[in-house]
Amino acid sequence: MLYENIKKLVEYGIQTGLTPECEKIYTTNLLLELFQEDSYEDVEIDSSSIELEAVLEGLLDEAVKRGIIEDSIGFRDLFDTKIMNCLVPRPAQVQKTFAEKYEESPEAATEYFYKLSQDSNYIRRYRVKKDMKWKVDSPYGKIDITINLSKPEKDPKAIAAARNAKNTAYPKCLLCMENEGYAGRLDHPARENHRIIPIEIAGGKWGFQYSPYVYLSLIHI
């Protein structure tokens, strides 16, 4: 199953445009290294309908089985982010593509970046679908009510491990530029698959990014 899921994930990367076809072998080898696997067999897969959630679930179960990670949501989220980073273009390439798309139109650039943020699993679409949203009337007009279920609660193992972890002030905050590519900790989300677009506003240097939790449609920071 490991070889099958690795091949499916690489194919997912190619289909979504995260991974160029010419990097298929390179990406496969990156994934094999994560699983401490020295060999590989090119197995047959059905590439017509690859479900990212199912593929990642299978890979995470394999990582638990091999003793690479503990079986808790905290460790699984850290590791599947590391897995996805094997598919995602480096920041310079993302910035270059964004700039090229911007020459076409700002809409083309932001649509590209939002799609990448979803395809890379930075925005976890299968969790966002679980969010509950509805509208209610009020004296001031309609109010949007949202119950965010896409941000998972920490399990007891993660809480205990975080309590014993070494304190650090890096990154400075959850939205700071230092998060791009950060491996994460049990008390700080992994952002290895995260990309930020540098922009200049009124002479100041800023970073454009989307929220991974989609409190509102296309919410960005």
Where are these regions (language model features)?
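Structured core elements
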Residues: 144, 207-209
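Extreme N-terminal flexible tails
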Residues: 1-175
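Short, flexible loop/turn elements at secondary-structure junctions
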Residues: 149-151, 210-214
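Short, well-ordered loop/turn elements at secondary-structure boundaries
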Residues: 139-140, 201-204, 215-216
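Conserved small/polar residues in nucleotide/adenosyl-binding loops
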Residues: 219-221
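Extended, Lys/Arg-enriched charged tracts that mediate electrostatic binding to polyanionic substrates
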Residues: 113-126, 174-207
